[in-house]
Swiss-Prot record:
GO cellular component, one term: cytosol
Annotated ranges, domain J: 4-68
Record-linked CDD domains: DnaJ, DnaJ_C
Molecular-function GO terms, alphabetical: protein-folding chaperone binding; unfolded protein binding
InterPro entries, per the entry: DnaJ_C, DnaJ_domain, DnaJ_domain_CS, DnaJ_subfamily_B, HSP40/DnaJ_pept-bd, J_dom_sf
GO aspect biological process, one term: chaperone cofactor-dependent protein refolding
Protein name from the UniProt record: DnaJ homolog subfamily B member 5
UniProt keyword terms in alphabetical order: Chaperone
Amino acid sequence: MGKDYYKILGIPSGANEDEIKKAYRKMALKYHPDKNKEPNAEEKFKEIAEAYDVLSDPKKRGLYDQYGEEGLKTGGGSSGGSSGSFHYTFHGDPHATFASFFGGSNPFDIFFASSRSARPFSGFDPDDMDVDEDDDPFGAFGRFGFNGLSRGPRRAPEPLYPRRKVQDPPVVHELRVSLEEIYHGSTKRMKITRRRLNPDGRTVRTEDKILHIVIKRGWKEGTKITFPKEGDATPDNIPADIVFVLKDKPHAHFRRDGTNVLYSALISLKEALCGCTVNIPTIDGRVIPLPCNDVIKPGTVKRLRGEGLPFPKVPTQRGDLIVEFKVRFPDRLTPQTRQILKQHLPCS
């Protein structure tokens, strides 16, 4: 003999739509496995979901009333009648039915809801909570002293609101880049491991994903590249954004100052006094001869215009290559050299 869906929900066969919803709400809350620890609660919870799935749909209910469970699922009655090509199969996930009915995958979120959300909880109607005290599906929570749910004299229920999902804080990673990568532009591949929701909306899986990070020419240190909602996902959160923050790698020859590049040129005292030509390397691998005919004092700066990094908003324009001179003095002088310098160098 097939299942009696009306009996499972505890309603007469002539029950209307509101009575069916009311019965499902009461029975589902009573037998939800998170609240009911009886051995058969899970199976009972599944039967309740299947009964509601059939009786809440006019087409399925009509076929069930005419042919029973067997006829509904096989497409025809035992007496040879036909219900057409429709064959019903329960999807098998009572938690999905519960989540769809109550508007959330966590069955008891409604009891810890706050006033943060202005949207009423669509699956809960206080007027429908007319269960007896001994059959109260929420009675087990009374011993924890939750506000409004403790056992004792009953009072008028207050409107409840769903707990709004809140996005997790951003997950920030430092991304080190060379000045050459900033000069030319580049694309980096970063592998992240994160948790994602399965199709049932409740369980999670771990998966890897490759993020392609496009670094545009001239981007400054501190620039943020954001991948929205690529963080861990759970039934109760909005995934965090993954954020990469650019950080300049130390360079063997150069230092960065915005779009300008600084280079320290070390010359001897003789070169500083007598003049020289200094070969200055550039970011793109060239060498520029820089004639120095005047006396070079320690800290002297010369500027090679347009040899720096691209401007972020106008990559065709570039900053400057700034050469800072350092003079290497000898550790000691011979008496003869000292005498010559005294004779030829000015006193001031």
